[in-house]
Structures are given as C-alpha cells and as structure tokens.
UniProtKB/Swiss-Prot annotation:
SUPFAM superfamilies named among the record's database cross-references: MurCD N-terminal domain, MurD-like peptide ligases, catalytic domain, MurD-like peptide ligases, peptide-binding domain
Catalytic activity: UDP-N-acetyl-alpha-D-muramate + L-alanine + ATP = UDP-N-acetyl-alpha-D-muramoyl-L-alanine + ADP + phosphate + H(+)
Gene Ontology biological process terms, A to Z: cell division; cell wall organization; peptidoglycan biosynthetic process; regulation of cell shape
Record organism: Coxiella burnetii (strain CbuK_Q154)
MF GO annotations: ATP binding; UDP-N-acetylmuramate-L-alanine ligase activity
InterPro entries attached to this UniProt entry: Mur-like_cat_sf, Mur_ligase_C, Mur_ligase_C_dom_sf, Mur_ligase_cen, Mur_ligase_N, MurCDEF_pg_biosynth, UDP-N-AcMur_Ala_ligase_MurC
Signal peptide interval: none
UniProt protein name: UDP-N-acetylmuramate--L-alanine ligase
Described purpose of this protein according to its UniProt entry: Cell wall formation.
Source domain of life: Bacteria
EC number, as in UniProt: 6.3.2.8
Pathway: Cell wall biogenesis; peptidoglycan biosynthesis
This protein's encoding gene: murC
Keyword Magnesium listed: no
Length: 465
C-alpha cells in the first residue's frame, strides 16, 4: 500500500507498547503526525510516547481506531483483535509495521540491517556512527540505545537506518540502497512453514530487492551467506574473520569488557585499529559491518573510530545492571536479550573472557514453546556450558503451550551431571529468593531471555542478605 502523505495525518498504532511499533510511532510523531494507540498495559515505551504527545488507551475494545486515516499493527496482533476488526469494518487502511516503515524509508537513502542475530546491535552501532559523523540520520532499531534512551530518531540528513525483520518476512516490504545480513539461522521457521530453504530463499529475495546500484554487505563467516553471496546480482561486500573476507578481522583480543582488533580492507594500505567498549567476537563482527558501510558512504575515519570506541550499546544486550548483595559479598547482575542457542553461546563466551576466574550462573527464560521445541537439542547443549543453570518456565509470547516443550522437558533432556547443577524456578517472582540461596560472592549472574525476565532486575539489585 502506498501512503498519500497529503491525507495521512492521523495514524493509530495497535500494540503501541512493543519496541517495533513504539519506535515507528515516535518517528511519526516527530514527523508531525497525530498518533493514537492502544495496548494492554503501560510500559516505558508508552510513557515515552505520551511525553511526545501520543494519545494512548490501555485496552483493545475497538473504539479508538475509527477516526484514524490509517492503522498500523505488528505481527503480535491477532486476526480477532477487536480494533483490527473495527478498522476493517470502518474500511480504514491497515498497514503492517514493516509496510509503514518501508514507506517512510522511500524518502531517504536507506540502509536495512537484517540477520538472525546481532542486527539490533549492528543497526544501533551504525546509527551512532552516523550521528557522530554529523550525517544527521533518521533511524529505527529494535532496542533502546543506551545513550539516547530511545529506539528511534528523526534527522535532517539523507540516510534512514532501520532494522529489517525476518521473523514475519516483513523485510520484503523494503527496497534498501544498502542491505546488511549478519547471519542466517533456523529461527522463526513457523513463518516459513518449517522450511529452512524457504527462509533462505526469502533472504535472497530481500537482498535482490536492493537498489540496482546498491550494495549488499554479508558476513562471510556464516556458511549460508557464503553460499548465497555468489548467487546475487548486486555488488557484494564481505566481512568476517574468514581469510577471504574483504573486511577481515585480525588480532582480536578481549580485555575485560572491551574488545581490541584490527580490520584489513581493500580501501586501506594499513589495517584499521579498532577499540570497542563491548566484549565478544560477535561484536567485533558487528563493528566490521559498520566499518564497511562507513566506507561505502565515505564517512570520516576518525569519527568512525571514535563512534565505535564510545558506543555505549543497546539496552538488554550484555547490560550490566548492578550487584546483588549477598550475606558475605556481592554478585554481578548482567542482562542479555539473546534467546537463541547461538546468542546464548556468544554471551557466555564473552562473560568467560571478561571474568575467567568467576563462577557463571545463567538464569534462562526460554522464549516461545515453538522455539523451545524446534531447538531443544541445541538449547540442552549450550546450557551445559554454564557453571550453574537456573531455568525459568517458558515465556509464551502469546503461544499456546506445546506438549514436551516446556521447562521440565528441557531438564529431562539434560545429562545427569547437568541436571544436578540446574535449579528449576517455575514462577519468576520466586527468582530473587532462589538466587539469594544459591549464589556465591563474586558470581556472575546472567539474566538471559527476551521475555519478561528483565522485570525482576530491580528486585535482584536491591536484594539484601
């Protein structure tokens, strides 16, 4: 659907409290639209939007939507949602979140960042670099940037940086000038009828929708992207630790929670020395993707390096929350949004490198029954890498329970040795008491998951022995 900006003055957002729709609403507000919205309950996102002028109600009874010029909804909104049904009855144009985003991006030189893992940090890091280089970008990413405390910005520059979502295939609405893919993994397969090859072909379609004179940036360390790269008709730039990557990461080392490495590239006679205030080889890859794009747009090199060095990260991405006070010392609390086995593996590796002598306690809240079922073996394998596992019940994210895909099913799949160092906590509110009992001074406690696990952070950090 094409938007006529002359008649679209009032947009209603269903599920406005979600990170994706709230970011879109913020951009619409800053572009002068009247924004109304609805959700089931208030949160930090709705509070931020209300301060910006959004009119929000906390129910879905269908009364608020009928005066809007168009309505935007996310994949979390079901077909029987009263507001969705009311909009259809009133013949109000309905756009998916990704469709509205793609319409906004058409006004700019657009950069879309896709991938199973790392796209939020990469798009956030890229947005920060463009701001630091005075390119005054507009951006919309899938997390709250720690420096600006917002997932979105409207600038006066030529560039629009956005996270591209494969979870509902809505990245196919986009036709970017530059497309980035960090990796491809077997996630969100329900969107693709359980067919990984269909997921892969959809990524190819997305990349082939890049502008004819555009650029595709791919991580060559990913075997699927390595397979895809020669098939594309667009100009391809590759990056990675791989020896044949055009932008190649070398001499990586981690010092505490900082990363140091060099990037060899065709554009430079000497390697680029990069410092990041973030741990993990996965973040070195994210920074290398940013460097490749910076070269495409001819960004000032000192500004690029400064932006990488001082990028403070994205909320819930290896975020240090504080210390939990124990009777005889403290334990450090870290929160991370990762909910796929490969993301958990990267988080644990970064934490091990930062604190090699300290015990790792992983508190994991599985996200979706379908993902738990599809990746059960992979979860069991990666969870065994922690010193102690505290397993919460699956966060449903709106799914109905699936037999054999809950927390107890995960434990039953574990080896006897792993099961003996696992504590199952069915109710999130019981977590502070459990951690007080099992934690030891100097423990690193990682709260891992994309559900509501973060809501317990305040209680943990303020818990006294």
């Amino acid at each position: 659907m094409q938007l006529d900006k002359k008649i679209i003055n009032h947009v209603h957002c269903l599920g406005i409290g979600g990170i994706g729709v709230s970011a879109l609403a913020e951009i619409l507000l800053k572009k002068g639209c009247r924004v109304t919205g609805s959700d089931v309950s208030p949160n930090k996102n709705t509070e931020r939007l209300q301060r910006l002028g959004a009119e929000i109600i906390f129910n879905h009874d269908g009364t608020a939507i009928t005066q809007a010029d168009c309505a935007v909804y996310s994949s979390a909104i079901g077909a029987t949602n009263p507001e969705l049904m009311a909009a259809k009855q009133a013949k109000i144009p309905l756009l998916k979140r990704g469709e509205m985003l793609a319409n906004l991006m058409k006004e700019y030189q657009s950069i879309a960042v896709a991938g199973a893992h790392g796209k939020t940090t990469t798009s956030g890091m890229l947005s920060h670099a463009f701001v630091e280089a005075n390119l005054d970008p507009t951006f919309m990413v899938g997390g709250v940037l720690n420096n600006s405390q917002t997932p979105a910005r409207v600038g006066n520059g030529h560039y629009f940086i956005a996270e591209a979502d494969e979870s509902d295939a809505s990245f196919l609405f986009m036709h970017p000038d530059i497309a980035v893919v960090t990796n491809i993994d077997a996630d969100h397969l329900s969107t693709y009828d359980g067919d990984f090859n269909r997921l892969k072909q959809t990524y190819i379609q997305f990349l082939e929708q890049t502008a004819q004179d555009g650029v595709v940036v791919l991580c060559l360390d990913d075997p699927i992207l390595r397979e895809i790269a020669p098939l594309l008709s667009r100009r391809v730039i590759t990056y990675g630790f791989s020896s044949d990557a055009q932008y190649r990461v070398v001499d990586y080392c981690q010092q505490g929670i900082q990363s140091l490495f060099q990037i060899h590239s065709p554009q430079r006679k000497a390697p680029l020395t990069v410092k990041l205030s973030m741990p993990g080889q996965h973040n070195a890859l994210n920074a290398t993707a940013v460097t490749a794009i910076a070269d495409v747009v001819r960004m000032n090199e000192p500004a690029l390096l400064k932006s990488l060095a001082d990028f403070p990260g994205v909320d819930r991405r290896f975020t240090i929350r504080g210390e939990m006070i124990l009777p005889k010392g403290n334990a450090l609390i870290i929160e991370d949004y990762g909910h796929h086995p490969n993301e958990i593996k990267a988080t644990l590796a970064a934490a091990r490198a930062a604190w090699p002598e300290r015990r790792m306690v992983l508190v994991f809240q599985p996200h979706r029954y379908s993902r738990t079922r599809d990746l059960m073996t992979e979860f069991v394998s990666v969870l065994a890498e922690t010193d102690w596992l505290v397993l919460l019940e699956v966060y449903s994210a709106g799914e109905m329970p699936i037999p054999g895909a809950d927390g107890m099913a995960l434990i039953k799949m574990m080896s006897n040795g792993m099961a003996q160092k696992t504590t199952f906590v069915p109710l999130l509110q019981n977590l502070p008491e459990t951690l007080q009992k099992l934690s030891q001074p100097n423990d690193i406690i990682i709260l891992q998951g994309a559900g509501n696990i973060g809501s317990i952070v305040t209680a943990l950090v303020q818990t006294h022995g």
